[in-house]
């Protein structure tokens, strides 16, 4: 669905507004091993003063999907594990690939994983250029074309059945190397528990 200029402007304004309050999520981000400066680079924010129509996202982490033309989507994550749903999106918004700017920054290899915070972890904390999708069932055919020129594509498979199935489905589309994470772990939890070297070694980059 093509966005109007006013929709894009609204998304951009909301992203900037929420980014000003990212300090409110400092403790949460620290628990995920993500420094505040990394969160700022990713333009993460907190919905402290909701834009009109965003009242349902009050208090959530805002995650903008940034392209060369600016913010094209916003997703919102609960900062309180007791609050469901964990993730919320804009009404009527289609799922998109996250962190597409890394496609241009990457050289001969790129990572693919589930989840925005896992993507930030790989890209900014581990040093592996990475794109992400919101969940295992969110892959689209045109994403395959976006990654077709890379010599190596690492798919980081969460340590659960959907994660394994996600990696296998991508292996049918692209020549990927599957990096299988331990049972019950995703990229971010493995990074927090085992460190940068562990993840790079799992990918064969050490």
Residue ranges and their predicted role:
Residues 112, 150-162, 180:
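Acidic beta-strand-to-loop metal/phosphate-binding motif
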Residues 106, 178-182, 197-206:
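A charged alpha-helical hairpin associated with nucleic-acid processing machineries
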Residues 49-151, 166-167:
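Phosphate-handling DNA/RNA-contact segment within nucleic-acid enzymes
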Residues 165-174:
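Short, aromatic/basic amphipathic alpha-helical patches
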Residues 60, 145-150, 188-200:
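Short, surface-exposed amphipathic charged segments that create phosphate/polyanion-binding patches used
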Residues 1-62, 67-68, 104-105, 204-206:
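TOPRIM metal-binding catalytic domain and adjacent DNA-binding surface shared by DnaG-type primases
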Residues 133-139, 158-161, 181-184:
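Short, acidic/turn-prone active-site loops that include or flank metal/cofactor-
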């Amino acid at each position: 669905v093509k966005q109007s200029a006013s929709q894009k402007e609204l998304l951009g304004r909301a992203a900037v507004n929420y980014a000003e309050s990212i300090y409110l999520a400092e403790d949460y981000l620290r628990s995920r091993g993500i420094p505040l400066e990394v969160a700022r680079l990713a333009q993460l924010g907190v919905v402290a003063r909701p834009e009109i129509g965003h009242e349902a996202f009050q208090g959530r982490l805002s995650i903008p999907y940034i392209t060369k033309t600016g913010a094209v989507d916003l997703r919102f994550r609960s900062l309180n594990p007791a609050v469901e749903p964990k993730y919320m999106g804009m009404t009527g918004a289609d799922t998109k690939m996250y962190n597409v700017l890394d496609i241009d920054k990457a050289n001969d290899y790129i990572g693919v994983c589930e989840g925005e915070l896992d993507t930030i972890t790989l890209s900014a904390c581990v040093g592996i250029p990475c794109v992400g999708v919101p969940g295992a069932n969110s892959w689209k055919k045109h994403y395959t074309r976006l990654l077709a020129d890379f010599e190596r594509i690492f798919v980081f498979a969460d340590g659960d059945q959907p994660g394994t199935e996600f990696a296998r489905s991508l292996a049918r589309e692209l020549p990927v190397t599957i990096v299988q994470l331990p049972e019950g772990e995703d990229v971010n939890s493995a990074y927090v528990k085992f460190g940068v070297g562990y993840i790079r070694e799992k990918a064969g980059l050490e």
